[in-house]
Amino acid sequence: PHVALNLLALDSSLGTDVATAILQGGADAVSQAGAFVSGGHTIDDDEPKYGLSVFGTAAANAVVRNAGAQPGDKLYLTKPLGVGIVTAAARIDCIGQEDLRPVIDSMMELNSAGSKAMVAAATHAATDVTGFGLAGHLHEMLEASNCSAVIDFPSLPLFSQAWQLCCDYCRPGRTFSTIEY
């Protein structure tokens, strides 16, 4: 990465100290990745949201797309699953800070180690697991690669409480649109 732009939505009644702390955390992460923040955009919103739009370059042989998976490839996950489920539960006070903290720590962790390992292993295809979850993103990758996959569900790394929360129907809003997809 070379440069990043902040994208912050925050209730203005929280004051500038909260915004400053969030933006400083983002700047620290961007610096850790070897880039700098050149600006961004903020909006007043009841629900806090923060992200970065990151710009950079990569060598052609280091670009891995979500198409190109081949029969026999293994699926590697670099972080546990269940971020959306656990954060949805936190928003409605169904879990405590002790269950939320590992999720926050994971979201703050850079993906650089996984990226380097993926390139070194000459990975055929990759995807991120974000709003559409593993099912949605894996489906997209497999469809683009004209492949199928067998998942050993019990071996999937999950955040504490994620499975029980899912069974209790505490799921992020996108869950059911992913099922329709």
Task: Go through each PLM region and give its residues.
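Asparagine-centered polar/low-complexity signal
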Residues: N6, N111, T178-Y181
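Glycine- and other small-residue-rich loops at beta-strand/loop junctions that grip anionic moieties
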Residues: H41, A67, T78, V103, ...
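Glycine-/charge-enriched secondary-structure boundary and capping motifs
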Residues: S13-F36, I43-Y50, A120-A121, A126-Y181
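Active-site glycine-rich loop that binds ribose-phosphate moieties when present
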Residues: S53-V63, E98-M118
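Short hydrophobic/aromatic-rich motifs at helix boundaries and adjacent loops
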Residues: G84-A88, M107-S112, A135
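Short acidic/polar active-site loop segments enriched in Thr and Asp
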Residues: P1-H2, H124
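Glycine-rich anion-binding loops of enzyme active sites
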Residues: H2-G96
